[in-house]
Amino acid sequence: MDPIRTSRLRAPLLASALLLAGSSVCAAEPDLETELRLNAMIGDTETAAELLDQGAHVDAPNQFGKTALMFAVEGDDLETVALLLSRGADVNARTVAGCTPLTFAAEAGHIGISALLLERGAHVHDRTRSGWDALMIASRHGITDMVEQLLFKGADPKAADREGRTALMQAASKGETGVLPLLIEGGADLEARDKQGATALLIAADQGQAGAVETLAGLGAQLDAVDALGSTALILAVGHGHVAMVERLLAMGADPNRQDRKGTTALMEAVATDHAELIDRLIAAGARTDLKDDADRTAADIAVQLGHRQAIARLAPKASKTP
């Protein structure tokens, strides 16, 4: 069989796949390497083997740096992955963006393929250009089996990306609660901070991930930790209007009267957006109306300044009773 020839049945699939594999739309026919990547992509192990026998370079990349092995990994094609590795494919090859076969497997959750890659020498600590390793990627997608496998193989749960974010922070930002205990058991630092001074709990609060906040607090994370600007989880949640998050934080004992570096309280944040429901909940939880920010303004002053009628209606009577 001529591996360059394609059947009529597969022609529509191959035509679109050729572009992904790296073939020029103007080419009369793809070269051996493009055909290899293509067949790795569609899972044709037999044809891939014949192309290699004809001299196709196993690690030839497309314009984005993707090799046949990476395409096979993405397609969850264990047979083709095994073939390419047996023919000398670089298990640690990198794309232009720094992705490796292992990071592709981690993102897709292909646990069997990642096991084979690791067995063949895949570097568990390799990073993409964004600074993400396979553990961060698997954690972000909540793939518990992959996280367990990578931790067992020595992945570092304390490693951070270019923004200073760890695998725990990645999972927290997406609300992947099932991954969080695994990372803590594996040695992740609950109170590690990114470049903005935020902990995993603060990141979860900022993203409205109430379940993640509750899980992290249950694991021992500080509820009233502050970021570089002095904001607490409660202040961040109020600022984004995350009602369910605010309710949980208050129920867990978050202090409604903490102030950030500019003196802003959670109540002032609620007033700034004229969020009546949050104003009521914060006041009911003991938020003080007499606290002032660095501009010497109370929450009522801010409400009047902004012309927020709902806030004024709720705060004016209370402000007048303040001694």
Swiss-Prot record:
Keyword Repeat in annotation: yes
Protein name listed in UniProt: Ankyrin homolog
One Pfam assignment: Ank_2
ANK repeats: 31-60, 64-93, 97-126, 130-159, 163-192, 196-225, 229-258, 262-291
Origin superkingdom: Bacteria
Residues in the signal sequence: 1-28
UniProt keyword list: ANK repeat, Repeat, Signal
